[in-house]
């Protein structure tokens, strides 16, 4: 019996697009309503199976001249499947962590990042019996975001101990992927500080597959060496770390940071200054392994294939597959980042199409690669790199066909390469600037110029990097050449980042981003047949969407003005208290002993978030005393907008308080160890605010004592920042 062929006559040339959109819509639904849907996963699986059976039945028994029933069943099946895969992935991350401090055996899963006082990494919990009570954990295999202190504040070592008091001093060694750590700490659920407008770090970690977070003090963790349970991906990252360490003998810190990022995808040594330079100059994609890097490597392999005998199809196919295996090995060594996986899959689809006389570079291949990625990692849909990678490639595939290259350039390879690079840069920047503005709030305007230097230099660095890593005895000879190229690129990009007007600061809302993409889509439809045959219907739609976008942004600016209010910002150190009169006039009250520099460090994350969204001018930083018409601060008490706030961050003695001062809010911070009854000898509050800097013991104790005194309690650890409208 002849197997029926999938009827695609009435579909567009990209059937994978519809499947991808349906699957992505299901992923969005599953993420938005996870709590309500997680109990119905089994029924959803049955529904997917039923839809597949119906689709197969349509292929055999329905009129094959009509594709609507098949497309409908396939679309609904992909939609439900996307929901099922996302919900199942989220359920696999759920865990109830043990209460209190326990001993964990953790394997370093990714490349650790060394900060000034801590190591930060993602670790996987390994099977172990608790040293204290012999209980077996049920959280085996879960990922935890760990921060381990390198030393105590006073520089003294403390012992990794169990309940019997035995222990060993923790070793501060260079951490690598695959190292096994014994940690005595408490693992908590993912949470944020709860400040308004802050980056949702907990959600970002969850979408990376992380289930908990932990902080381990110095001396309470110990590096026991290489783990015996390393998977292949961790072994690859460990090998990469050794390669980077060997390169450090011949390259400076800045050169090593950029070189290892471009060639191996190791960005752990790239500091904030380098990131800002590359971002402001519009070439941050050079530091992130993506289709650019795989395209360079595969282009080199294509040069080799051109000299082979194409008539020997089997041998030629074998060489193509060998090249693809090389790309997969490169992606494996880099840790399989989403952008690199997308590029590798797309190149694989392209080579298959090309071998069978199909169109190699098509939108269908792009969405086929995306569908495969989401099928195995549904939360990759929310990854910024994944979105930017797809947007840039989709823009290039769609818009490059509209740009006609003059025939005179076809005879001049160098000039043709320059024009092609400029066009690709313009199209990629046009396709990604809404997402870049939404996530990073900046749009580099001179990215096209920067790419003329960054892309060729990255090409040379990647080629030389292959020789540098494969032939170690040439490293001393190649180091000066690499230093020259890296210095050339870094100097030029640093100059481009400082050019006046080179960066546009733009903070669009999600609605505005969607409308901008509507404008781009309508423009593409209008110019689809060329400049001479403009479809003015779509031009009018684009103008309407652009006008609506401007209106949405103007309304957002009008809504951003702040009314008088007091905000207690969440912080694990001293709590910054923000007295806001208006967006242009405010005061930031810091705890005693923390001056302007300390305030700058603690509230740095607020500048690019809540303050920028509401156009808040730099506040007046208050440490001890302030006397203004609208604000008065004296010691540990402040008056603003008819409200009185007192803060306690030191031990108070009983019997020394006179008449209690009536206050609206009593802020209790780390350092306060006196019972609440003693604090009430000094202050008579309407509400007690507990800082997140308090330990669990003191937070529970103060909360219980406040309830016994019939006082309102606000726990910043559980509820985040406290915002009081005046």
Predicted regions and their residues:
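Membrane-interface helix/helix-cap signal primarily in integral membrane proteins
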Residues: 2-9, 65-69, 77-285, 614-633, ...
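Hydrophobic alpha-helical transmembrane segments in multi-pass membrane proteins
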Residues: 3, 18, 26, 65, ...
